[in-house]
A protein has these predicted regions:
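Helical hinge/lid and interdomain linker segments adjacent to catalytic or ligand-binding clefts
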Residues: 151-229
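Aromatic-Pro/Gly-enriched surface loop or interdomain linker
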Residues: 43-184, 258-260, 267-302
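Transmembrane alpha-helices
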Residues: 18-28, 114-115
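A glycine-rich, often tryptophan-bearing local segment used as a flexible ligand/cofactor-contacting loop or short
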Residues: 198-281
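Intrinsically disordered, low-complexity segments enriched in small/polar residues
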Residues: 4-5, 23, 59, 276
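Hydrophobic single-pass membrane-insertion segments
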Residues: 28-39
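N-terminal Sec-pathway targeting helices
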Residues: 3-22
Length: 302
């Protein structure tokens, strides 16, 4: 008759120890602190009134909401809604005393270490009687010449949240106008941070793309060329964004244009990738400077 073969005998002690290790591992994984962020795709535009704050974006005509637990915000944030727009009308952002160590970690080290360029032309282009009124056929060619704003009025399209966060972290700031009037100004800084500077002049484009260390913190930057008239204090669309021909996309024919990433506002796989004169982000981090430590760390460390 065939010889009976006994299966391997597992020590009860080993088995019990293994179960204990599995339980401990599960507890440790569950206890790791996480930023409580979720993406809600429903078409509702209200802010949470309790423990969460809601940031709303528009993605190809579809409203997307990013929901963040208030305790995970990196700054005390007060949002004023705009009844006529899905995006906030304004924000007040202040540091949290308990995050002082983190702020020091991600702050600019000195006045010439890093500078960001505020997109003042983009702010105006998206404004009333601006370029988008022309694109939407609500206005004729006269809307392609726009007044240069006298000051910052940060909006969603002009990188509202990060343009308020970076000054709190000691980053120097200049505007499109500063670079257009004096392109060499960028040479003063080790690192240049470009936000959603969609509309820039040729002199500004050349100054940015020739700088050796640029962080393109938003996609769709350097997308269309404008021309300034400082006598009239205006700027005019020259080329790009389907103008003067619908076949024209990037007004500078820039081979590193990354506008395809601007439609990813969830940023679930956000990273910076390398190009010859710096790094670019692979999604549209609209409000991430308010709650995502890794975003601010990447800007600092890149």
């Amino acid at each position: 008759m065939p010889r009976k073969v006994n299966g391997p005998v597992v020590s009860r002690t080993v088995l019990v120890a293994s179960v204990i290790m599995i339980v401990i591992g599960a507890v440790l994984i569950a206890s790791v602190p996480r930023t409580r962020v979720s993406l809600d795709d429903t078409n509702v535009n209200t802010h949470s009134a309790s423990d969460y704050v809601q940031f709303t974006t528009m993605n190809e005509g579809k409203i997307e909401k990013i929901i963040v637990h208030k305790s995970d915000l990196l700054f005390d944030t007060e949002i004023t809604d705009d009844k006529n727009n899905i995006h906030p009308k304004s924000m007040i952002i202040e540091k949290k005393p308990e995050l002082a160590d983190f702020y020091r970690q991600v702050a600019s080290t000195n006045a010439t270490d890093a500078v960001f360029v505020y997109p003042i032309f983009t702010q105006a282009a998206y404004g009333k009687d601006g370029f988008y009124n022309y694109y939407n056929k609500d206005c004729d060619i006269k809307c392609l010449t726009v007044a240069i704003p006298p000051g910052f009025v940060p909006t969603y399209s002009s990188s509202m949240s990060i343009s308020k966060v970076l000054p709190l972290l000691n980053y120097s700031e200049i505007t499109d106008v500063d670079v257009d009037k004096n392109p060499d100004i960028l040479k003063k800084y080790h690192k240049v941070i470009i936000l959603h500077n969609e509309y820039v002049t040729k002199k500004e484009f050349d100054a940015i793309t020739s700088h050796p260390h640029v962080i393109y913190a938003f996609p769709n930057a350097l997308y269309a060329e404008v021309r300034t008239n400082y006598t009239d204090n205006t700027f005019t669309l020259v080329r790009g964004h389907g103008y003067p021909s619908s076949s024209i996309e990037n007004g500078f024919d820039w081979k590193f244009d990354n506008s395809r990433y601007e439609y990813d506002t969830a940023c679930k796989n956000m990273t910076f990738y390398t190009i010859p004169n710096g790094k670019m982000v692979n999604c549209y981090p609209a409000y991430r400077s308010l709650f995502d430590k890794s975003f601010l760390e990447m800007i600092k460390e890149s």
